[in-house]
Design a protein with these regions (language model features):
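Short, composition-biased local secondary-structure segments
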Residues: 14-18, 121-127, 175-189
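Catalytic core of membrane glycerolipid acyltransferases/transacylases, capturing the structured
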Residues: 109-168, 195-197, 201
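Hydrophobic alpha-helical segments typical of transmembrane helices
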Residues: 10, 22, 45-48, 126, ...
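Membrane-anchoring hydrophobic helices of lipid-metabolizing enzymes
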Residues: 1-114, 158
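Hydrophobic (often cysteine-bearing) scaffold residues that line and stabilize catalytic clefts
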Residues: 61, 144, 148, 255
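Non-catalytic C-terminal accessory region of glycerolipid acyltransferases
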Residues: 37, 56, 63, 105-108, ...
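A conditional alpha-helix N-cap/helix-loop micro-motif detector
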Residues: 93-97, 145, 164-167, 206-207, ...
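Conserved nucleotide-sugar phosphate-binding/catalytic loop shared by glycosyltransferases and other
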Residues: 65-68, 163, 170
């Protein structure tokens, strides 16, 4: 085991020992310094929020930025929770599930099910839930840090999730799983590689967006649901939500437009919990907003 790997594991074990309500308070305190001190997370988040919410007053924008930095930090502080022994899954009422009936109905329809989510709340909570309840496959791009990759991959595999790379081999595996009437889950709000998407509006801005979902639905006839995870107030836990089925098939452009529209509606429910520190507008017809 490398020094970095040992360090990562020690941090995760330490964070796992801290009660979640205490982690929540730590997040509130530390995120204040993220807000007042210069840093790249603050810079990118602020640029994204200004682009998406140009009509916000300065005071409202600052409040949203501060909350956004808190929730971004919580994803880090929750690493012990989601990548450790996952004891939280046994706590009564810590995880609430909304509209699971919609997913159950789709699973009983003798078709594959494609779930997609934005990076909102903590998607590792979603992954752990899906792995504990269903035969689920998830495509992902491995982290560049090999030590972190080892921890993440082991945790997700232990959760019961089948992880595949986002290469041609992985896409073939996804197609097979959907045709075999299984579940595939994708965080499809990230900017895809050139050739793997189309330009589509996101909060009124033309951005390069993933076109994989409408292609998968068209090729397999699977049922598509948006799902997301949001934090409860005051460190009380999480809520996992499943929306009713939506149609992304047919014309690829229309399918991607519908996907982004669903993202917008989802994000507006808890805009402070979306990962605004990600460079969502790095491939766009607009002038770069990150300079």
């Amino acid at each position: 085991m490398s020094l970095y790997s040992a360090l990562f594991r020690s941090i995760i074990r330490t964070l796992e020992l801290i009660p979640y309500t205490v982690l929540f308070k730590i997040g509130k305190l530390v995120s204040y310094f993220l807000y007042v001190l210069p840093n790249k997370h603050k810079k990118i988040s602020n640029a994204n929020l200004k682009q998406v919410f140009p009509g916000l007053k300065e005071t409202e924008l600052k409040k949203l930025l501060k909350l956004s930095l808190f929730h971004s930090l919580m994803n880090l502080l929750e690493s012990g929770l989601v990548w450790g022994n996952k004891i939280y899954m046994k706590k009564i009422d810590f995880i609430e599930i909304e509209n699971i009936e919609a997913l159950d109905n789709s699973l009983n329809s003798n078709k594959g099910v494609l779930l997609f989510t934005p990076h909102l709340g903590n998607i590792e909570i979603l992954i752990n839930f899906l792995g504990s309840k269903f035969d689920c496959t998830i495509p992902y791009t491995p982290p560049k840090n090999k030590s972190l990759e080892s921890i993440v991959t082991k945790s997700r595999n232990n959760a019961g999730v089948n992880m595949v790379n986002t290469d041609s081999k992985g896409i073939k595996e996804i197609l097979l799983r959907l045709k075999d009437k299984k579940i595939v889950a994708i965080a499809s709000d990230q900017v895809p590689k050139t050739g793997a998407g189309v330009y589509s509006k996101f909060f009124g801005n033309e951005i390069y967006s993933m076109s994989l979902l409408p292609k998968l639905q068209k090729n397999t006839g699977c049922i598509v649901h948006l799902m997301y995870c949001k934090r409860k107030k005051n460190g009380e836990g999480f809520v996992i939500c499943f929306d009713d089925p939506i149609d992304l098939s047919g014309d690829i452009q229309k399918g991607v437009d519908n996907m982004n529209n669903e993202f917008e509606k989802c994000i507006m429910k808890v805009p402070e919990q979306y990962s605004w520190e990600y460079k969502k507008f790095k491939k766009t017809k607009l002038k770069s907003i990150y300079n």
